[in-house]
Amino acid sequence: MEPIILIPGLLCTETLFAPQIAALADHPVMIANHRDHDSIAAIASSILAAAPERFALAGLSMGGYVAMEILRQAPQRVSRLALLDTSPKPDAPEQGERRRVLISLAESGKFSKVPHLLYPGLVDASRLDDEGLKSVVIEMAIETGAEAFVRQQTAIMGRADSRPFLAAISVPTLILVG
């Protein structure tokens, strides 16, 4: 069976993919570590260093930014791709400013506020009052921690514009938003 690498989004852990991991029980599944570096390129390099020679790849949001970078660095190793709720565009200036405000909160000891501020933008409006879902999101954020959050946000703000690269993707690709 072909291995599958799943790359979570900002402040997310393997918990994000629990239903997929269960559904893919017959496949080797690897959840990428995207918490230790402050650049998308370094995160991608680290994942590639731990990855099998060839694999399927899926990334959600920030994980999609990393997946596109993995394809830039080692396209021959990726057999198929899923880009989920992500964008090839770099941050607009106002997005960068919002990220800097959240980094400032995290660095000033107020990280516990961050997942609550992010939550409305992470879930569909119909799920805003879903306390079970909110608790999972907050638990993943707590597990990730403030220092990793700052590294993740720094990486996201410095990511490359992937739009010029999209035409070079030659593997079967699913793009899913919703």
Predicted regions and their residues:
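Conserved HGGG/HGGXW glycine-rich cap/lid loop of the alpha/beta-hydrolase fold
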Residues: M1-S46, L60
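A short beta-to-alpha transition loop/helix N-cap that caps and shapes the active-site region
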Residues: T13, D38-I40, T86-E94, A125-S126
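Gly/Ala-rich beta-loop-alpha elbow adjacent to hydrolase catalytic centers
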Residues: G59-G63, A67
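Flexible "cap/lid" loop of the alpha/beta hydrolase fold
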Residues: R72-H116, G121
